[in-house]
């Protein structure tokens, strides 16, 4: 089974990818993790990616595609199946990915887009608070500390990460709408895309995804 999973930041993509990976024994391919691993290992593509990151530039599509190709070119990896998370983010990336998968005769079984209202995502993410020394995550509504603004374990002041500030979240959502949302239309035209409401409970979202996959792989 080969799945592409995407959706805006804060929609619960990582959680669902982990559930799918464990339930169906699929590899979870996160392009972000791939990049970090390649840079850490000092591979040719990793060094190339680092040169762009160090200049504050986006890593070019051909570098990301190259990393995905390194993975899918291994027959065992193709046979296991995978969930592609965080890629493609633009239509040109989707087209490049199509060419790569056609080269290795890999059909995508399903493209799942998790959706959520912008205000729901802002509420989810802007409510997060972090304990600086341990990285423990709290939420002012869903998982509040016993004492407001203080870590239960260390007593230190909780902080708001830059990524969790409302202005940053809205900017990320705007970028997503402009670049990634058209990717859903691209896959809809191919008849492989399905949308799932990501604001439901984790179990409900997981159940809906399973129903879609069962139908797609009949």
Curated annotation (Swiss-Prot):
<feature type="binding site">
    <location>
        <begin position="10"/>
        <end position="15"/>
    </location>
    <ligand>
        <name>ATP</name>
    </ligand>
</feature>
<dbReference type="InterPro" id="IPR033690">
    <property type="entry name" value="Adenylat_kinase_CS"/>
</dbReference>
<dbReference type="Pfam" id="PF05191">
    <property type="entry name" value="ADK_lid"/>
</dbReference>
<feature type="binding site">
    <location>
        <position position="93"/>
    </location>
    <ligand>
        <name>AMP</name>
    </ligand>
</feature>
<dbReference type="InterPro" id="IPR007862">
    <property type="entry name" value="Adenylate_kinase_lid-dom"/>
</dbReference>
<feature type="binding site">
    <location>
        <begin position="137"/>
        <end position="138"/>
    </location>
    <ligand>
        <name>ATP</name>
    </ligand>
</feature>
<feature type="binding site">
    <location>
        <begin position="57"/>
        <end position="59"/>
    </location>
    <ligand>
        <name>AMP</name>
    </ligand>
</feature>
<feature type="binding site">
    <location>
        <position position="36"/>
    </location>
    <ligand>
        <name>AMP</name>
    </ligand>
</feature>
<dbReference type="InterPro" id="IPR000850">
    <property type="entry name" value="Adenylat/UMP-CMP_kin"/>
</dbReference>
<feature type="binding site">
    <location>
        <position position="172"/>
    </location>
    <ligand>
        <name>AMP</name>
    </ligand>
</feature>
<dbReference type="GO" id="GO:0005524">
    <property type="term" value="F:ATP binding"/>
</dbReference>
<feature type="binding site">
    <location>
        <position position="128"/>
    </location>
    <ligand>
        <name>ATP</name>
    </ligand>
</feature>
<dbReference type="InterPro" id="IPR006259">
    <property type="entry name" value="Adenyl_kin_sub"/>
</dbReference>
<keyword id="KW-0808">Transferase</keyword>
<feature type="region of interest" description="LID">
    <location>
        <begin position="127"/>
        <end position="164"/>
    </location>
</feature>
<feature type="binding site">
    <location>
        <position position="200"/>
    </location>
    <ligand>
        <name>ATP</name>
    </ligand>
</feature>
<feature type="binding site">
    <location>
        <position position="161"/>
    </location>
    <ligand>
        <name>AMP</name>
    </ligand>
</feature>
<comment type="function">
    <text>Catalyzes the reversible transfer of the terminal phosphate group between ATP and AMP. Plays an important role in cellular energy homeostasis and in adenine nucleotide metabolism.</text>
</comment>
<comment type="similarity">
    <text>Belongs to the adenylate kinase family.</text>
</comment>
<feature type="binding site">
    <location>
        <position position="31"/>
    </location>
    <ligand>
        <name>AMP</name>
    </ligand>
</feature>
<dbReference type="GO" id="GO:0044209">
    <property type="term" value="P:AMP salvage"/>
</dbReference>
<feature type="region of interest" description="NMP">
    <location>
        <begin position="30"/>
        <end position="59"/>
    </location>
</feature>
<keyword id="KW-0418">Kinase</keyword>
<keyword id="KW-0547">Nucleotide-binding</keyword>
<protein>
    <recommendedName>
        <fullName>Adenylate kinase</fullName>
        <ecNumber>2.7.4.3</ecNumber>
    </recommendedName>
</protein>
<dbReference type="GO" id="GO:0005737">
    <property type="term" value="C:cytoplasm"/>
</dbReference>
<keyword id="KW-0545">Nucleotide biosynthesis</keyword>
<dbReference type="Pfam" id="PF00406">
    <property type="entry name" value="ADK"/>
</dbReference>
<dbReference type="InterPro" id="IPR027417">
    <property type="entry name" value="P-loop_NTPase"/>
</dbReference>
<dbReference type="GO" id="GO:0004017">
    <property type="term" value="F:adenylate kinase activity"/>
</dbReference>
<keyword id="KW-0963">Cytoplasm</keyword>
<feature type="binding site">
    <location>
        <begin position="86"/>
        <end position="89"/>
    </location>
    <ligand>
        <name>AMP</name>
    </ligand>
</feature>
<keyword id="KW-0067">ATP-binding</keyword>
<comment type="pathway">
    <text>Purine metabolism; AMP biosynthesis via salvage pathway; AMP from ADP: step 1/1.</text>
</comment>
<comment type="subunit">
    <text>Monomer.</text>
</comment>
